[in-house]
């Protein structure tokens, strides 16, 4: 076969393979057997091997994998991948519905539309396409940053490597030339494919459930092995700035035209009754058996322009909620009750259980939350209890089976002193928790603070696990997190099971953490009430730790998502001698204690403004223009209302311009918009 014939055959095979992928994953109407599909793919791989210059990044042959990835770089998400608020109560679904409707502009309250869709139990990922070609796949991570797993994502057959419906009846890639778009969704494994995967593994290496199998597979270094494990990508979000597409349902339809599988079961609901019927229907279908795992229903406001109006909190959008199906329950027996001490001194009772299967995993521990809960449930040693798993990592005890209680058992004795250091416990007024007040001298608190400091969302020190932290603190080598940076391989080798190589690796991991982002350092400090989102807001308001240390309670209270309680906590933390000493050690070690200097606009001319673009702009794409507004403190919305501050119009503007003028909204040309942008300078 000469090169001209090879080109024609490669094109034919690619088109056929893409078409069969689409029929199998999107339409669920396969035309050929797996054997026939594999034969075509093998022929394509062989031809591209013979003519390597004809191989392209969007060829189906790229799904075969085979490359080895030594690490997965961290990447920033264009927009945060927020988690959804969730509920297990159908009544709370109704409250969500009425709350959202009440927030809508008056003209939309009589006819609200919500989209109900299945909540697949998988792993959230983000796909980035440039000029219609897949260029990046990333995990959700902490919502702001994730891991680049592009090589593994390429192996998933339901992920289009090139946008466009292979059947020839959809959107062409031309629509996205010169543009970047983002598609988000869930990767999951069907029950059948999960069973096949586990069948080929030793008993001790089998995965507990399809979700765990999916999460583990996506982080494998060998993409060839990933390609052999069948996974499915279901798309649920498209970042699309087109003025013609104003509803979530339309975006789902566009995703299908672009070659994505969307689940095909979404429904536009116009009343609360519609929503309840959808939920009830899928609860029944779930009990009769589905080919995949779903753990709930997601409800989203359909109108994307109204979504922009409602916005989001630091954790979740206001216009969506996840209804989780009723939690699974199981019976087991309490072996013992232990009292754990957290990094802030909180005493938490935990039940050690007879191992039992629950929600696809083996459970041997269950939280009892607090000592008041122990008294309320009247939990006793050797009781038979009902445990429930409702999305928590550790299940909870919800009731005692009293008819199975042994005669003569006694109530749990509430400890009077800390199980770690022996300090008398205290219980602040109006709180349910008991605390150990010995924050400086309690070994359990010190260990928990070090573990928090090293955790992935904080300093991400690989290899610094619970067992090593236990030895470091018990030996006196580490008193606070700052001491970690003074460790040497020789010191670490004095610990149990620490050879020269592992000691060197740990020292290198600690050294690497010096360059973690400033907001993660703030989170790692373990300040009461300061989570990762609040740490990010504090870092934005106070770009150096010195500035933050000097801030007053009043000034801190003005920071987004920081109220008086958090402000008091932050202010008090930086006035503790132990915190000051630790920070000095971190400073000496070269840990980043200020935000990275970046270029900033010299003005905030769009600060707090809601801006709309209409018509074709000459100098910018719509996404570029929107980004410039965001950088200068504003936000873009999709529809004109009395709350809109500015409309920028280009060639052939639509009805938005006319509506803006009727409402008295300020309108400007692209040239005037460019003047408003001003110059961009440096903060150095």
UniProtKB/Swiss-Prot annotation:
Record keywords: DNA damage, DNA repair, DNA replication, Ligase, Magnesium, Manganese, Metal-binding, NAD, Zinc
Catalytic activity: NAD(+) + (deoxyribonucleotide)n-3'-hydroxyl + 5'-phospho-(deoxyribonucleotide)m = (deoxyribonucleotide)n+m + AMP + beta-nicotinamide D-nucleotide
Enzyme Commission numbers on file: 6.5.1.2
Keyword rRNA-binding: no
Name of a matching Pfam family: DNA_ligase_aden
Cofactor names: Mg(2+); Mn(2+)
Taxonomy, superkingdom: Bacteria
Protein's name in the database: DNA ligase
Organism: Chlorobium phaeobacteroides (strain BS1)
Gene symbol of the encoding locus: ligA
């Amino acid at each position: 076969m000469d090169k001209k014939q090879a080109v024609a055959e490669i094109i034919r095979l690619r088109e056929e393979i893409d078409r069969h992928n689409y029929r199998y994953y999107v339409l669920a109407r396969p035309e050929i057997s797996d054997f026939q599909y594999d034969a075509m793919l093998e022929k394509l791989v062989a031809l591209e091997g013979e003519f390597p210059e004809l191989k392209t990044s969007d060829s189906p042959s790229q799904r075969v994998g085979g490359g080895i990835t030594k690490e997965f770089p961290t990447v920033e998400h264009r927009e945060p991948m927020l988690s959804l608020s969730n509920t297990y109560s159908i009544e709370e679904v109704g409250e969500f519905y009425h709350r959202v409707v009440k927030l809508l502009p008056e003209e939309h309250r009589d006819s609200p539309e919500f989209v109900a869709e299945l909540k697949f139990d998988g792993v959230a990922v983000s796909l980035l396409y440039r000029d219609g070609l897949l260029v990046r796949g990333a995990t959700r991570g902490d919502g702001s940053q994730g891991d680049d797993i592009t090589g593994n994502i390429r192996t998933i057959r339901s992920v289009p490597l090139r946008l466009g419906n292979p059947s020839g009846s959809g959107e062409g890639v031309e629509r996205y030339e010169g543009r970047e778009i983002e598609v988000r969704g869930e990767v999951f494994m069907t029950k059948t494919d999960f069973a096949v995967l586990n069948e080929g593994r030793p008993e001790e290496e089998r995965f507990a459930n399809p979700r765990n199998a999916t999460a583990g597979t996506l982080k494998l270094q060998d993409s060839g092995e990933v390609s052999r494990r069948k996974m499915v990508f279901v798309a649920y979000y498209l970042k699309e700035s087109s003025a013609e597409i104003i509803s979530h349902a339309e975006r789902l339809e566009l995703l299908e035209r672009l070659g994505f599988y969307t689940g095909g079961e979404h429904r536009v609901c116009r009343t609360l009754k519609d929503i309840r019927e959808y939920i009830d229907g899928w609860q029944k279908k779930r009990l009769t058996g589905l080919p995949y795992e779903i753990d709930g229903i997601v409800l989203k406001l359909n109108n994307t322009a109204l979504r922009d109006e409602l916005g989001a909190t630091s954790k979740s959008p206001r216009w969506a909620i996840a209804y989780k199906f009723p939690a699974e329950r199981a019976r087991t027996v309490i072996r013992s009750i232990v009292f754990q001490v957290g990094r802030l001194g909180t005493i938490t009772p935990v039940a050690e259980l007879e191992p039992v299967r629950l929600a696809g995993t083996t459970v041997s521990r269950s939280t009892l939350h607090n000592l008041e809960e122990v008294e309320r449930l009247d939990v006793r040693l050797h009781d038979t209890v009902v445990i429930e798993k409702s999305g928590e990592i550790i299940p909870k005890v919800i009731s005692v089976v009293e008819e199975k209680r042994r005669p003569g058992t006694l109530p749990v004795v509430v400890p009077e002193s800390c199980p770690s250091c022996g300090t008398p416990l205290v219980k602040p007024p109006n709180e349910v928790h008991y605390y150990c007040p010995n924050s400086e001298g309690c070994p359990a608190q010190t260990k928990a603070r070090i573990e928090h400091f090293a955790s992935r969302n904080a300093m991400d020190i690989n290899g610094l696990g619970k067992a090593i932290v236990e030895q470091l603190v018990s030996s006196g080598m580490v008193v606070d997190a700052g001491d970690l940076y003074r460790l040497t391989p020789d010191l670490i080798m004095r610990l149990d099971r620490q050879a020269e190589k592992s000691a060197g690796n740990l020292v290198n991991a600690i050294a690497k953490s010096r360059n973690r982002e400033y907001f993660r350092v703030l989170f790692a400090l373990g300040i009461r009430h300061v989570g990762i989102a609040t740490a990010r807001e504090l870092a934005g308001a106070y770009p150096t730790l010195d500035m933050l240390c000097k801030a007053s309670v009043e000034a801190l209270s003005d920071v987004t998502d920081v109220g008086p309680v958090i402000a008091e906590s932050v202010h008090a933390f930086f006035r503790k001698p132990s915190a000051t000493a630790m920070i000095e050690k971190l400073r000496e070690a070269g840990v980043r204690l200020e935000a990275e200097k970046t270029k900033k606009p010299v003005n905030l001319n769009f600060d707090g403004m809601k801006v709309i673009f209409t018509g074709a702009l000459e100098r910018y794409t719509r996404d570029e223009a929107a980004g410039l507004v965001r950088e200068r403190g504003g936000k873009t919305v999709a529809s004109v209302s009395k709350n809109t501050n500015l409309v920028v119009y280009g060639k052939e503007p639509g009805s938005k311009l006319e509506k803006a003028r009727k409402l008295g909204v300020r309108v400007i040309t692209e040239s005037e918009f460019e003047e408003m942008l001003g110059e961009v300078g440096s903060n150095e």
